[in-house]
UniProtKB/Swiss-Prot annotation:
Belongs to the arabinose isomerase family. Its EC number is 5.3.1.4. This is L-arabinose isomerase. It comes from Thermotoga petrophila (strain ATCC BAA-488 / DSM 13995 / JCM 10881 / RKU-1). Pathway: Carbohydrate degradation; L-arabinose degradation via L-ribulose; D-xylulose 5-phosphate from L-arabinose (bacterial route): step 1/3. Mn(2+) binds at residues 302, 329, 346, 445. SUPFAM superfamilies: FucI/AraA C-terminal domain-like, FucI/AraA N-terminal and middle domains. Catalyzes the conversion of L-arabinose to L-ribulose. Its cofactor is Mn(2+).
Length: 496
């Protein structure tokens, strides 16, 4: 469902007419070699497109106008090969709506000690050209990612590739919508938020449909489509064949088919449900939700559209990478001193992209919702480094709370627990990480990912100009408290 190849990134090289045609031709040739080399590297998720060397204010303004108007353009990469006076860039940068990366590099890796002359010096001027360009970004208070180093370095390419994935997620969020079936769970605070502000800052269009519309579509699903889907279930999962289970699984298959049709029709990228508003649905969507998350849709339970949007954004960032991303909830604790752990799960809706084993379809009673016993996928989660992230609405801005965690093996069987689960150690440790999370107001609903790291989420928050706080192995609680206080002042003074 998610295709990062549909996007492209424009590579903009700055110079000026002062240098003359011969030098400008060399600038273009060297830029072309850089872009060709980058495009040959499979680390990059999308094509990088070299645009003509920019030498005047009118050329710069025109290229940004075109970038803004092109839905395929997910971001722009700028590099000043020579000195490009930054007043020429003000009009273009002032209208730019795309995520921007400032690449500070040089065509040649090393100084040619024996042959260097003033021709070489005049051609290779990014050392001061990019400083001039950096000033105008800082002066205009523009969000941007800065990557420094030679363009052939692995670390440089990794940082560019991460940012490109983030930019794709931003573009994706600006073009689809989040579908809500019903409202938020009653009386819950952290799942609420300003949907108008979300569309302004994050690009997410969030709208609600009555669950009755979905229920009518479920009733109309043909039996042959259900049987085709059951064949797929048997191939991908461990599936029971008893009559009680098959009846419940068929109902989830109907919900999945109807949901997918509805989401495609609405150009949706994510959706929410709530157990308090099920109308004529036969079951709370479980297996159906897990399957759609597996395809790439974002999801939030109990009407949590912020979690749904974040899950989708991270799924876009992690497309094609090892690991997976899921809606998650901090459910219960293991509090053995020195080995405190968090068991993450939800009633039904954990994405199988984070499974370490072949998932099992199981049918069990569910005490909430008042509907028939729902089918769901059950599995243990993957092990290794992961992130937990939550968006909360602080009244005057959104705050992204991020915690680095280590997912650990589940060493004991839990035969009576009928839900998918993952066990993790928060960094730096349970007490400090959880204290910081609670101080920051992080939600009980999160996006959990083994596919990305913290840098992706920092890039995302900075590009969208929203607040973020990171809880990791370097956490100092007193400094963290100060950061929260300073952020209150900064974001309170900041004008949009």
């Amino acid at each position: 469902m998610i295709d990062l190849k549909q996007y492209e990134f424009w590579f903009l090289v700055g110079s000026q007419y002062l240098y003359g045609l011969e030098t400008l031709k060399k600038v273009e040739q060297q830029a072309s070699k850089i872009v060709d080399s980058l495009n040959d590297d499979p680390i990059f998720p999308s094509k990088i497109v070299l645009k003509p060397v920019l030498k005047s204010s009118s050329e710069i303004t025109e290229i940004f106008e075109k970038a803004n108007a092109d839905p395929k353009c997910a971001g722009v990469i700028v590099w000043m090969h020579t000195f490009s006076p930054s007043k020429m860039w003000i009009r273009g940068l002032s209208i730019n709506k795309k995520p921007l990366l400032h690449l500070h590099t040089q065509y040649n890796r090393e100084i040619p000690w024996d042959t260097i002359d003033m021709d070489y010096m005049n051609l290779n001027q990014s050392a001061h050209g990019d400083r001039e360009h950096g000033f105008i970004h800082a002066r205009m208070r523009l969000p941007r990612k800065v990557v420094v180093g030679h363009w052939e370095e692995k670390e440089v390419r990794e940082k560019i590739a991460k940012w490109m994935r983030v930019a794709c997620a931003i573009q994706d969020g600006r073009t689809g919508q989040i579908v809500r079936f019903g409202d938020n769970m009653r009386e819950v605070a952290s799942t609420e938020g300003d949907k108008v502000e979300a569309q302004i800052k994050l690009g997410w269009s969030i709208n609600t449909w009555g669950v009755g519309e979905l229920a009518e579509r479920v009733k109309a699903v043909p039996d042959n489509e259900v049987e085709e889907l059951l064949t797929e279930y048997r191939e991908k999962y461990i599936m029971p064949e008893d009559e009680y289970s098959l009846k419940a699984i068929r109902e989830q298959a109907k919900i999945e088919i109807a949901l997918r049709e509805f989401l495609k029709e609405k150009n949706a990228i994510a959706f929410t449900t709530t157990f308090e508003d099920l109308h004529d649905l036969p079951q709370l969507p479980g297996l159906a939700v897990q399957r759609l998350m597996e395809e790439g849709y974002g999801f939030g339970a109990e009407g949590d559209w912020k979690a749904a949007g974040l899950v989708r954004a991270i799924k876009v960032m992690g497309t094609g990478l090892p690991g997976g991303t899921s809606f998650m909830e901090d459910y219960t604790y293991h509090l053995t001193p020195g080995n405190e752990l968090v068991l993450g799960a939800h009633m039904l809706e954990v994405c199988p992209t984070i499974a370490k084993e072949k998932p099992r379809i199981e049918v069990h009673p569910l005490s909430i919702g008042g509907k028939a016993d729902p089918a769901r996928l059950v599995f243990d989660g993957q092990e290794g480094p992961a992130v937990n992230a939550s968006i909360v609405d602080m009244g005057n801005r959104f705050r992204l709370v991020v915690n680095k965690v280590l997912s650990v093996p589940i060493e004991r069987k839990m035969p009576k627990l009928p839900t998918a689960r993952v066990l993790w150690k928060p960094l730096p440790d349970f007490k400090r990480a959880t204290t910081a999370w609670i101080l920051a107001g992080g939600s009980h609903h999160t996006a959990f990912s083994t596919a990305i790291d913290v840098e992706y989420l920092i890039d995302w928050a900075e590009a969208l100009e929203i607040e973020y706080v990171v809880i990791d192995e370097n956490l100092d609680l007193e400094d963290f408290k100060k950061e929260l206080r300073w952020n209150e002042l900064y974001w309170g003074l900041l004008k949009r």
